[in-house]
Amino acid sequence: MRNGKLMGDGDHDKQMPPFPRDLVLEARTAMKSSITLFWSFRSPYSYIALPRVVEISRQFGIDVDMRIVHPAALRNPEYFRTMNPLARPYFMLDTARAAAFHGLAFRRPIPDPIEQDPVTLALADEHPRARRLGKLGIAATERGQGLQFCVEVSRLLWDGRVNGWDEGSHLAEASSRAGLNLAELDASIAADPDRHEFSLEQNDAALRSAGHWGVPTIVFQGEPFFGQDRIDVLRWRLTQRISDPD
């Protein structure tokens, strides 16, 4: 090769053909065409982030590896005992504001998946609703419908249209919209509850190994992005690594 040209045996010099752009982009995308999302049903910021995660998945043509984790009250119960007294009021203000900013209907779930005194923040010993949601998320993820299940159930919990989200047919209808059968999910969990709980614990540990302790945390090529307010930074990073088909 000389000056970017191929030298033939007795032939005229030939210009090296350009490598097809679509193959270059395909190769780049194939290197790592997914993001990992650590996510909790009880986290309002997880709910607020999710529509933009879905948008990014479609925009860049990448998969979302859903990692459902326990709520913070189960991952780190000490947090509520040691938190700054200003943290809770600001949290309540900011979550409602962030939802409004992104055009999302918002109200805290009724009932709360976590049994917690609203004033003292003292936690109950058992949290059956939160544990059921987590295991349902694991079961949905195992069936390849984790992202859509979380979209539907988080709306059920957080958009304020339903009181008693855990009663009647609400969860069954949300599961159906995600292409799943709630009775089948519940039966699968009942057959092996410890395995589903272990999957949640593994995801809790994987979150910390990824470089953070809170949700939502998104990991792309080993780099963690914590918080719904880091999604634009993630989008910027993706444009550096993966072609935007739009």
Each language-model region and where it sits:
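Leucine-biased recognition of intrinsically disordered, low-complexity hydrophobic segments
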Residues: 6, 23-25
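Intrinsic-disorder-associated, low-complexity terminal segments enriched in Asp/Asn/His/Tyr and depleted
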Residues: 11-13, 22
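C-terminal cap of thioredoxin/glutaredoxin-like
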Residues: 33, 42-62, 148-246
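Structural alpha/beta surface segment adjacent to cysteine/selenocysteine redox centers
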Residues: 41, 47-157
